[in-house]
Each structure stands twice: as structure tokens, then as C-alpha cells.
Amino acid sequence: MSINIDIKKITDLLNSSILFPDDVQELLREKYIVLERKSNGTPTVAHIYKTMARFDNKSIYRIAKFLFMNRPDVIKLLFLKDVEPLLPDKSINISINNTEYPQLEGPIGTKIALLELFNAFRTGRSEPIPYYYLPLRKDINNIVTK
């Protein structure tokens, strides 16, 4: 009895950062998640933090700096140049991000950047947390069913 295993196919599958059921369960157990998205809004990476993003200790700005560190136009628009990025405790790849982001500038660019930032904060739990953390379940269901 021989089993035909295509090593290249398996390697490509693993390298494409497929989201496995264990990853979904882990995300649904996490309390503080920040989603990085493609320019079309599809989540690409879930960054997990053990502590809540807060305004009083400026951790929310540090998380924003990390989230947009590869997008200097957004860093400039949101006045985050002098802020040190806060690295996540863990990151889970959800999908491949091979798209270019449009250059954001002016008042409309600022609004788009803020909208993207405010939609990044998610939670997998249902316990009370600040208003800016939205439920993650909808995003995960959209990815798993695609």
C-alpha cells in the first residue's frame, strides 16, 4: 500500500498561513486582540496582547505604532513618530497580505487611518471590557467559511 504525498503541496499549504481550528479556538479565548488588515478589510494577522490598550499609559498609541509600522504615511498622519511600538505577546497569521496599501494623506486619509485603527481592536471573550474592543467572532467566521 503506497500513499501519494505531495510534499510541495503540503509545504505550500503550511507556508500560506492557513488558519487551523486550534488557532481559531485560541483566538476565541483571548481577551485583547488587534487585527491587521489588507487594504480591502480582510484580516491578515491577529496580534495578541496580554494587557488592555489604554489611553492613560499610552499603550494604545504604542500598539497603533506597531500596527502601522510598515506604513509611514499613517504614522505621520496619526502623529506617532516619537512613540515606541509595543510588540504583541503573540501573532497568528490568518491570511496572506500581498496587497499594496493606498497612500493616505489629508483629512480623508486621517479619517480612513482612524477608522482602520478603531476597527482593529477585538476580543474573543464575552466579559465586560472597554467599548473600543469589538467581538472577534464575526471576523473569524468570515475567514473560516471562505
From Swiss-Prot:
Disulphide-bridged cysteine pairs: none
Positions in coiled-coil regions: none
Keywords carried by this UniProt record: Late protein, Virion
Principal localisation: virion
Pfam families xref list: Pox_D2
Localization per Swiss-Prot or TrEMBL: Virion
Gene Ontology cellular-component annotations: virion component
Induction cue: Expressed in the late phase of the viral replicative cycle.
Function: Late protein which is part of a large complex required for early virion morphogenesis. This complex participates in the formation of virosomes and the incorporation of virosomal contents into nascent immature virions.
Subunit structure: Part of a complex composed of the kinase OPG054, OPG092, OPG100, OPG114, OPG115, OPG142 and OPG157.
Similarity comment: Belongs to the orthopoxvirus OPG114 family.
Protein name, UniProt field: Core protein OPG114
Source organism (scientific name): Vaccinia virus (strain Western Reserve)
Originating gene: OPG114
